[in-house]
Amino acid sequence: MTLLGLSACSVNARIKKADRKYAIGEYYEAGEMYRQTYRRISNKNKDLRAHVAFMQGECNRIINGSKAIGAYKNAIKNHYPDSIVYLSYAQVLHYQGEYKEAIKQYDIYLEAHPNDYVAQAGKYGCLQVEQWKHHSSRYKIALAKEFNEKRTSNFAPAFISEDGD
């Protein structure tokens, strides 16, 4: 019984410490602390697991980490009470190039908040990318090897006048 009480105190103390790291902007460290804490929380405590998973996702989203996808999935799986989790998850999917899944998550969020401009713009952006993929332009982008040669002495091309100025 005492061991269970110490374990719960340890988890709560770790969450508070991670919250302090998050508050001062140390997102990487806070994300790692949330990740380690998430593993220690019992599967029966869904509310706490959802909160910790969401905070881990927020930390990873802020530092542009792809780990945010898994964290947001865990928060949704554990029934995080705020619908903002769907918007954040959609944004991370959008950044990672998973546009179809991002559109689904934007739609879920827009059911609860139909007038949210950020979600509408995100969904529109995903739809535009899908459309652009099917209707590509005639322009081709190619690597300019002559500017990236290691053995050339031209570090950066420059224009000079006839006087040498």
Residue ranges of predicted features:
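Alpha-solenoid helical repeat scaffolds
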Residues: 15-16, 47-55, 84-88, 104, ...
